[in-house]
Each structure stands twice: as C-alpha cells, then as structure tokens.
Regions:
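Short beta-strand and adjacent tight-turn residues that come in two discontinuous sequence segments
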Residues: 61, 79, 165-167
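Short, Asp-centered acidic motifs that coordinate Mg2+ and/or phosphate
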Residues: 74-78, 162-163
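A conserved helix-loop-strand patch within extracytoplasmic ligand-binding domains
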Residues: 81-82, 90-139
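Short glycine-rich anion-binding loops that position phosphate/pyrophosphate groups of nucleotides
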Residues: 81-84, 169-171
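Small-molecule-sensing regulatory modules
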Residues: 2-41, 46-47, 54, 130, ...
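Short, structured active-site "lid" loops
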Residues: 50-74
Length: 251
C-alpha cells in the first residue's frame, strides 16, 4: 500500500540538497512510498543582523520545522546536526543519522587569492571557531558573517573579508570543494558536535523502520557521544564548546 512521506527542510540550497539526499534514499529503498519535500524559512534564516547567541541560539533554525512535525504537515525533518540544539523535545526524537561527511572546518580565501593576509577580518561568527583561530592566527581579527553558504561566499568575494571559516561538509555537498584553501585538522580546530552528520527528526511513537539501513551506527554513536559531552558542559551558541568523537570499532 502506498504511503506518503513529507520531509521538512529549510529553504537554503544546501538544506534542500541534504533533504533531497534523504528523499532519494527513501524512494530507492521504499518504492511504495510517495515522498515530498516541504521547504520553509526559519527564524534563524531571517534574522541575519545579530549573532545566534543574541537572538535565541540554534533553536531558531528548527522552531518552524518542529511545528510542522507537531502539526502533522510533515513526517520528518532533515537537519545539519551541528545546527540543532543539544536538547530536542521528547516528542520529536532524532530517529536516524547519516553517514558522516568530512567533519573538518576549512579556510576559504577570496577567489584569485592564494595566501591569507590580515588587512581585513576573517568572517566567522562561532565563538568555538574564533577561540581556536586565535591560537592559529594570533594576528587575525574577526567579524560576524551570517547567511547561507552562498551568501557568505559572495560577501567574501566582494572584498568584505580576508577569509571565511566554513564546514567542509557543506561545501562538498554543494559541489564547491574547489573553494577550500586549507583544511583545519581536528588537532588544530575541534569541530562542532555532530559536524558532517545529518540528523533526521520524527515524531515519538511512529514507525521509522524504513530508515534502518540509512541509519549509520558509527555516526550515530559519535553524534550521541559528542552531543552528550556538550550537554554536560551546558554548551550552546554562547559557549565555545567543541566535541569530536571517533568510533574505534572499525579502526
């Protein structure tokens, strides 16, 4: 019997690409399911003139998606796990975790530049990143940059910044790996909890067994470990807490 599944997603190009990855998996592995994507703009996508800790934290990226789940306008939500609050409502649990893409942060220079100079600030809003960058580049200054990845790259190429710090996973999923000037190893810059992993959120009590083979055990274990570590330290947008776990099972 055919079953319709609606997946909630933010409107940005990266968010839609990530959601389409999940949609393709379901359509390939569960051909009896009809899958649709419901895109929406979140509060975090709209408020761009202030840093996240000034306007309510990472919850601003999930509020509208959570409401769609609760109202049954959607059946799943796809998130970049690093952008999710460390505590999720009991009624809206994380039901699956993707295989982990590259968890590293990266340095991105303006087009045509091959070396980092410090005459302009590095575009970076994360306290986690800034604190670690101050060790790597003590002569650097920093300025807030908000917006989706493509908006940030445009601001960089327009001459507003000497460089950006972004997540490798997002650039790779956008097909923009060539923009990466330098990978920052975890020993240099510890990533955010869950970085590189997609978290799929559903409703408590519903049957999500169709995601069993999508769910990556190593990524799940690392994600839960990292998120628990940050929760214990009461870390959030205003706290420079980082966490990076490795699964030793297959090493």
């Amino acid at each position: 019997m055919s079953r319709k599944i609606v997946i909630g997603s933010r409107e940005s190009k990266l968010a839609v690409i990530q959601t389409e990855m999940v949609k393709k998996y379901i359509e390939t592995n569960c051909p009896q399911m009809q899958v649709e994507v419901l895109t929406m703009k979140t509060t975090g996508d709209v408020i761009l003139d202030r840093t996240l800790d000034q306007v309510g934290g990472k919850g601003l990226f999930v509020k509208e998606l959570d409401k769609a789940l609760m109202d049954r306008r959607s059946d799943l939500s796809v998130h970049s796990l690093k952008d999710m609050p460390m505590k999720v409502p009991e009624e809206l649990p994380l039901v699956a975790f993707s295989r982990r893409e590259d968890p590293r942060d990266v340095l991105v220079l303006p087009q045509g530049m091959s070396e980092l100079n410090f005459d302009k600030p590095i575009g970076c809003s994360s306290k986690r990143r800034i604190l670690q960058l101050q060790e790597l580049y003590p002569q650097a200054t920093f300025a807030t940059v908000r917006g989706n990845v493509l908006t940030r790259l445009r601001k960089l190429d327009e001459g507003n910044f000497s460089a950006l710090i972004l997540a490798a996973a997002g650039l790779k999923r956008l097909g923009l790996e060539e923009r990466i000037s330098r990978f920052l190893e975890p020993e240099e810059m510890i990533p955010a909890a869950g970085q590189g992993i997609l978290g799929i959120q559903g409703r408590a009590g519903e049957d999500y067994r169709f995601l069993d083979t999508y769910n990556d055990a190593d990524a799940r274990d690392c994600a839960l470990c990292e998120r628990a570590f940050v929760r214990i330290l009461d870390g959030g947008c205003s706290s420079p807490v980082a966490a990076h776990a490795l699964s030793l099972i297959h090493i």
